[in-house]
């Protein structure tokens, strides 16, 4: 059985592996496709930049699992993705959110860590 960290790494590796959908009703004369980013593992359209930031931070040695606390000011999607991946990979995360943030988004962030 794989470790939790190994499973988390597999989740992060799947970021960007999202479906393409042809928009044939909107553009009948041209082949136009949309990439469905909300199908990323975190459910956030900001999964790519969030996973990139964590990956680059680890490569540079600025982030160390189980030692580093990630701090992010967020108003939504980036925080959702960062909290999902950071928690999965063993980072503590603290988020600064605006008062006007929806209760639903606050609940997602609390659930993620």
Question: Could you say what each language-model-derived stretch is?
Answer:
Residues 1-113:
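PLP-dependent amino-acid enzyme catalytic core
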């Amino acid at each position: 059985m794989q470790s939790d960290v190994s499973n988390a790494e597999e989740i992060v590796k799947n970021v960007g592996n999202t479906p393409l959908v042809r928009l044939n009703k909107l553009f009948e004369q041209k082949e136009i496709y949309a990439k469905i980013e909300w199908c990323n593992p975190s459910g956030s359209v900001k999964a790519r930049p969030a996973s990139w930031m964590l990956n680059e931070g680890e490569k540079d040695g600025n982030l160390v699992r189980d030692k580093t606390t990630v701090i992010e000011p967020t108003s939504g999607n980036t925080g959702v993705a960062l909290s999902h991946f950071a928690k999965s990979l063993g980072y503590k995360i603290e988020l600064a959110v605006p008062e006007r943030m929806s209760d639903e988004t606050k609940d997602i962030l609390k659930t993620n860590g």
